[in-house]
């Protein structure tokens, strides 16, 4: 099956990748579309999202003796890992809510690697925004839950949460991304993004990748209200540019105007290149354009 549609996909991929690289405004429009879409869906469903997120606290007797393992460094012990609460009560929920929009069709395309939520989104709005280039995007949505002791302006991204330049030179070879040198204030790191900038489906659908990150931020009520539990405080949304925008045209990752957009991650040197993460600074990201949004959920 690997080679059944390979040649036509190869031809279409290179032709359409070049078109996107030559016309970066198309990618920027669909990235803003994806960001605004999630913002609207969250705003329209605030009550449901907040209620289901906070329900985890009322269910305390059911998990208190077998809590999730803390993956942080030197935890104080008074903070419960809330990662999966955000993934289910926000991430999975948003996929369902997006699919219910009148002008949107969602397909859960089989991909063996990628972010928490990944699906093909088709809409006539995309067709209009891209001047008929495509009506579809590959939505890559990751949930990054944080509490009051975590940074709310950092995103820590794995290689499979970032797309690269996406060269496909030989039919048999498949797509390869260039390694990138990430320079931070005090150190540097080699980073290898592992996601292509676009997908071509077997039916000919052109699907540029749109990377969106949802950052549910919870409050530890023991610190703020003299209470117990961890309640949803706010949600940050971020749109990280596609690999073509980052590393090709306009090349945000290399532009001094966005210095330290990427910084070395928190993995030690023993980690494989395919596992080493990188940090994105949301304060720098927001300088590129309307790339970061915040929704107050503490109501």
UniProtKB/Swiss-Prot annotation:
Keywords: Endonuclease, Hydrolase, Magnesium, Metal-binding, Nuclease, Restriction system. Mg(2+) 2 binds at residue 116. Its cofactor is Mg(2+). The keyword Transmembrane helix does not apply. It catalyses: Endonucleolytic cleavage of DNA to give specific double-stranded fragments with terminal 5'-phosphates. The keyword Hydrolase applies. Coiled coil: none annotated. It comes from the Bacteria. Binds 2 magnesium ions per subunit. GO terms for biological process: DNA restriction-modification system. InterPro entries: Restrct_endonuc-II-like, Restrct_endonuc_II_BglI, Restrct_endonuc_II_BglI_sf. Its EC number is 3.1.21.4. One of its GO terms (molecular function) is type II site-specific deoxyribonuclease activity. Homodimer. This is Type II restriction enzyme BglI.
